[in-house]
Amino acid sequence: MSIEEFKDYIINEFPDRKVRRYIRETLKLLISDPFKYAREKLGRDIYGNPMFSIEVTGDIRILYSIDPENCVVFIWEVGSHKRVYGR
């Protein structure tokens, strides 16, 4: 997914501007230090990288993984707790 597609997804999925601002702020935190803000370790992604979840709001989470060797953060899902965790 390109950056433009990601922006469109966020706008379509989260019509509330305040929530989008929280998502943007949380993504900035992840860029600055992805390990510092990891709240919940979830195992490993399909590439063997450690996966984490970070809370954006009470119900919205960002599911991501980190490739520590290449300093890359992969965003797997942004959504409600139910959508991200499937329950």
Predicted regions located by residue number:
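Basic, Lys/Arg-enriched alpha-helical interface segments
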Residues: M1-D59, D67-V72, H81-R87
